[in-house]
C-alpha cells in the first residue's frame, strides 16, 4: 500500500481529537490527501456499534461480546475505509485503534489474552499503523479535562466514568506498549499548550514520513 497510516492513542481527555484536526489541516496545506477517522466508528455500521459500546449497553452482555462487537466494527472500518484509502495513497489519521483495545479490553482479564490475539489477527488482516502518537498526561489531569468537556456537551460515555485508579492503570498500560514497540510509537507530553504539542507532532511527521509519502 502506498499510503501512510497514523494513529493517535491515550487515555481520556488527552486531546487526541484536537491534535488530529490540527495535523490534518497542516498536511492538507502541504498538499497531502488526508483522511481522518475514528474507532470505534468510521462507517455507518461501526458508528452504530460505537453507540452501543459507549452507552454501556454492551456491558449487559459481558466483556466477550463487547470485544466481539469491537472486532466487527474494526473489520468493517478497515475493509470499507482504511484499506481503500491507503491503497489510494492517502495519509490516514485515526483516533484510537488496536492499542486502545489492547489497553481497555486487555486490562479486563475475563476475556483472556489468547482470545484478544485471535480477534486482533482476524480484524487487522495485516494492516497496522506505521506511526502511533501516544498523548500522555497524568490520569487526574485527563479526568479533569474530560469533566470539562462533559459539562459542555452534557454527555458522558461508558469509559469516561471509570475511577482515577483505573485511568492511571490504562495510562501505564499505554506507556508499556510504547516501550514494547519503540519503532512505531512516539510518546508526546500532552500537558503543555495545544500549539506546542501540535508543533512537536508536525516535527515528527517531517522526520518520519513526509519524505516517504509522495
Curated annotation (Swiss-Prot):
Acyltransferase listed as a keyword: no
CDD domains for this protein: TMPK
EC number: 2.7.4.9
Reactions catalysed: dTMP + ATP = dTDP + ADP
SUPFAM superfamilies associated with the record: P-loop containing nucleoside triphosphate hydrolases (SSF52540)
A Gene Ontology cellular-component term: cytosol
Top enzyme class: transferase
Superkingdom of the organism of origin: Bacteria
Gene Ontology biological-process annotations: dTDP biosynthetic process; dTTP biosynthetic process; dUDP biosynthetic process
Keywords: ATP-binding, Kinase, Nucleotide biosynthesis, Nucleotide-binding, Transferase
Molecular function via GO: ATP binding; dTMP kinase activity
S-S bonds: none
Residues given in the record as ATP binding sites: 10-17
Role this protein plays: Phosphorylation of dTMP to form dTDP in both de novo and salvage pathways of dTTP synthesis.
HAMAP family: Thymidylate_kinase
Sequence similarity: Belongs to the thymidylate kinase family.
Protein name per its UniProtKB record: Thymidylate kinase
